[in-house]
């Protein structure tokens, strides 16, 4: 076996690990916008305009995480210990943060204790809850995939994406949306790309990226400035957001495989970073203390934003 094959077999593809890192950075950026108070700040403020347009990458990144899972797990057996490890990691960070907070705060809060003891059941972090539910379902999803031919698989995806993405993006059938169901659909798309090696998608990827990026930017500005429900749904299942995430994912899997131990080391901490910074106790503390609104009109705003992101990325290594 040559060195390149050994790297592919024994080490994770650093293209995908780099994509994971970029995704968690995008999610932190999204949370900095979503959980901060920007009342009375308008799009005339350039920093705010850029943050408003870029933060949507957080929602897109959630889809990319699931696409990656579908791409790599479709041909694997999900072992019970992997599911248990995922659940225990979620519980560990929840317990640890609760204990530290209670000690520092000097008093016991019953609601915090209850929510911390059962983070998955109380949906303290919707992404982690949905991801764990998806992971539990993967063995059964993979059985379905194995028993479908390409035509059946394609038809199933067409129906699912139409019902749960295209129509809701136009303000139709929103009441039937479920993030868990959407994660299953996105997983199926990632698995489809892996199973059938969609070369035609690779060839059209640049066009998809440009079209979806421009379309999404126009939609966001129109929605904000004129308060028009042109695209009523700006959730993870928004069709244009899904296409943009898909094109980013395809770009990274289409690159030449390489290995970098530093990228892979940082990437291995992504789940922990997500669990810590978006913990229901930590979340309000971070975005209240950083007070981004006070810096939004400063020329060094983005340096401040980058500093916050770097600090959050380093939390797991403290």
What are these regions (language model features)?
Residues 1-163, 210, 257-265, 269-272, ...:
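Membrane-cytosol interface segments of multi-pass membrane proteins
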Residues 32-37, 101-108, 162-176, 215-229, ...:
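C-terminal ends of transmembrane alpha-helices
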Residues 56-59, 127-131, 176-183, 188, ...:
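Residue-level hotspots within the lipid-embedded alpha helices of multi-pass solute transporters
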Residues 66-69, 186-189, 244, 248:
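Hydrophobic/aromatic residues in alpha-helical transmembrane segments
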Residues 78-84, 196-204:
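Hydrophobic, small-residue-rich membrane helices and short re-entrant helix-turn-helix hairpins
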Residues 96, 100, 104, 137, ...:
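Alpha-helical membrane-inserting segments
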Residues 153-197:
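Loop-centered beta-sheet repeat module
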Residues 173, 181-183, 198-274, 278-308:
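Alpha-helical transmembrane segments and terminal signal-anchor/GPI-anchor hydrophobic tails
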């Amino acid at each position: 076996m040559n060195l390149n094959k050994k790297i592919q077999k024994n080490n994770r593809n650093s293209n995908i690990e780099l994509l994971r890192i970029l995704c968690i950075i995008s999610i932190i950026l999204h949370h900095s916008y979503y959980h901060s108070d920007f009342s009375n700040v308008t799009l005339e403020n350039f920093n705010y305009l850029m943050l408003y347009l870029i933060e949507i990458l957080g929602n897109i990144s959630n889809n990319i995480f699931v696409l990656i899972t579908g791409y790599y797990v479709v041909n694997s057996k999900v072992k019970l210990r992997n599911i248990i490890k995922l659940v225990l990691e979620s519980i560990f960070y929840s317990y640890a943060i609760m204990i530290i907070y209670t000690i520092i705060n000097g008093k016991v809060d019953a609601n915090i204790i209850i929510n911390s003891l059962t983070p998955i059941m109380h949906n303290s972090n919707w992404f982690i809850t949905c991801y764990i539910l998806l992971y539990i379902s993967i063995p059964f999803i993979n059985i379905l995939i194995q028993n479908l031919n390409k035509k059946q698989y394609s038809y199933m995806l067409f129906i699912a994406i139409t019902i749960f993405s295209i129509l809701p993006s136009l303000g139709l059938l929103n009441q039937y949306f479920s993030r868990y169901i959407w994660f299953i659909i996105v997983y199926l798309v990632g698995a489809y790309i892996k199973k059938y090696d969609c070369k035609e998608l690779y060839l059209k990827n640049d066009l998809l990226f440009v079209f979806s990026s421009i379309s999404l930017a126009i939609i966001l500005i129109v929605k904000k400035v004129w308060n028009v429900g042109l695209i009523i749904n700006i959730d993870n299942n928004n069709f244009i957001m899904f296409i943009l995430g898909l094109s980013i994912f395809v770009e990274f899997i289409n690159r030449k495989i390489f290995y970098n131990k530093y990228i892979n080391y940082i990437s291995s901490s992504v789940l922990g970073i997500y669990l810590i910074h978006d913990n229901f106790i930590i979340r309000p503390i971070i975005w209240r203390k950083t007070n981004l609104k006070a810096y939004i009109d400063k020329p060094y705003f983005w340096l401040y934003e980058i500093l916050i992101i770097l600090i959050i990325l380093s939390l797991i290594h403290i």
